[in-house]
């Protein structure tokens, strides 16, 4: 991380499932609290895998958060004394999150966002590419391929132990029971056209 000379910027943490995005978001938020900064943490209400009132990493690290149904709800929970705004699972929000995150940074807040950069199909996921484009800092994390142990940048969705079809719904909230990290060579999407 580099030193910012002005207040207000946007950091994005992205990567596949099991790459440590939530864990890294929690680490950055904890550092801010150690520095006596006032922090507000948010996540979408759809993310209820481990807790409805906390951001929880797959390894069990957690931090209390506000579960919100729309990006505009963030404004209801921050004040002028807030220094840092963190949002996990940003891929589940609509386009409004891009404007809210940008506006927060413009107003002087340090904004930390985390989310999947690709969906299970291996395609850009929702608003994350737009957030990536406007962020001052982008950290792309990789997991470990569950097949070969190579660095994994893809999320493999499994239905009854088999790769999900390209035509399956993009959003299916789940964890290890439904997903694995895979490298480019072991990521399978039946029905996806080969270019």
UniProtKB/Swiss-Prot annotation:
Its EC number is 2.7.1.21. Gene3D superfamilies: 3.30.60.20, P-loop containing nucleotide triphosphate hydrolases. Belongs to the thymidine kinase family. One of its GO terms (cellular component) is cytosol. Keywords: ATP-binding, Cytoplasm, DNA synthesis, Kinase, Metal-binding, Nucleotide-binding, Transferase, Zinc. ATP binds at residues 15-22, 88-91. NCBIfam families: PRK04296.1-1. GO terms for molecular function: ATP binding; thymidine kinase activity; zinc ion binding. InterPro entries: P-loop_NTPase (IPR027417), Thymidine_kinase (IPR001267), Thymidine_kinase_CS (IPR020633). PANTHER family: THYMIDINE KINASE (PTHR11441), THYMIDINE KINASE, CYTOSOLIC (PTHR11441:SF0). This is Thymidine kinase. It catalyses: thymidine + ATP = dTMP + ADP + H(+). Homotetramer. The active site is at residue 89. It is an enzyme of class 2 (transferase). The keyword RNA-binding does not apply. PROSITE patterns: TK_CELLULAR_TYPE (PS00603). GO terms for biological process: DNA biosynthetic process; thymidine metabolic process. It is found in: Cytoplasm. Pfam families: TK (PF00265). Zn(2+) binds at residues 145, 148, 183, 186. Its main location: cytoplasm.
């Amino acid at each position: 991380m580099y030193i910012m000379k002005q207040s207000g910027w946007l950091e994005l943490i992205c990567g596949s499932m099991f790459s440590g995005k939530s864990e890294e978001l929690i680490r950055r938020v904890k550092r801010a609290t150690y520095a006596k900064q006032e922090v507000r943490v948010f996540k979408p209400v759809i993310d209820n895998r481990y807790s409805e009132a906390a951001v929880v990493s797959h390894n069990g690290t957690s931090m209390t958060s506000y579960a919100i149904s729309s990006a505009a709800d963030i404004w209801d929970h921050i004040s002028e004394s807030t220094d840092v705004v963190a949002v996990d699972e940003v891929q589940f929000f609509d386009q409004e999150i891009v404007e809210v995150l940008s506006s927060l940074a413009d107003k002087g807040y340090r904004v930390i966002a985390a989310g999947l950069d690709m969906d299970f199909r291996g395609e850009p996921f929702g608003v994350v590419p737009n957030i990536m484009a406007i962020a001052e800092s982008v950290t792309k994390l990789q997991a470990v391929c569950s097949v070969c142990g190579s660095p994994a940048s893809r999320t493999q969705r499994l239905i009854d132990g088999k790769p999900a079809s390209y035509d399956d719904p993009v959003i299916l909230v789940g964890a290890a029971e439904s997903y694995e990290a895979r490298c480019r060579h072991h990521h399978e999407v039946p029905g996806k056209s080969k270019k």
